[in-house]
Amino acid sequence: ANGKNGIKSGATTDEEGEASLTIRELTLSINASVNDAINAEQYLAVESGTLNLATADVALHCDLIMDIGAEGTDGPTIAIAEACEGIEAAALSIRSGDISIVCTDDCLNAANSDLANYDFAINISGGTIVAYTTAGDGFDSNGSLTISGGNVTVWSGGNADNQPLDADGTIAITGGTVLAAGSSAGMGMNLSTTQAYVIFGSAGISGMGNMGGQPGSFGGMQPPQNGGQPKSDSKVSGNFQPSDDFRPGDMTSNNI
């Protein structure tokens, strides 16, 4: 059933529209052995509740538009323990929530190979996101990537081609707290920022703000030798710590 997806909204009988799915005040635990844990065609909204997801493909997938949380709310709790890709839509907005992701490809992905000339976008304006991928990009948009609020901690895989933050268009950091780590520090990315951030990896370090250094420096601080990757026996959670000598929770807007 449902192509072995956990939950799927398919096409409606109305030729002018496709089905949508809204999740509100539910507690769901889904293990999808083949395809997506939750799949919607036109619109997927996760407003509140608790989702515990594991899947062989994408944990949360929508062909077009996905909204997670809402401004002024605590939003949902989403724990993705295992997936190929974590959260995928052509246009993805995260406004609130507590989200943890462990996957083997992109943690957040704005893409759809069936759409041409689409304004692909990832927009993060609130919530707490802790994401780790073993072999992909942390956040990957085929268009723009904008972080204007929230607390973001992301690790990308060991492959030098992968970046913690990756976009075909502009990456804009205008608010929130951002810590991104991986083998590539994203030196070639099209980054526009108006506030403090930290991006580091074995290929280099970049950053700005009042860290005791100039843009492009790290204020004398050194990243962990393992590239910021969590220990193999660690579990992702809202206070996830990657190593004994490095604690992203300590890096708040007050001491960046």
Task: Report each predicted region and the residues it spans.
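A composition-driven surface/loop motif
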Residues: A1-I256
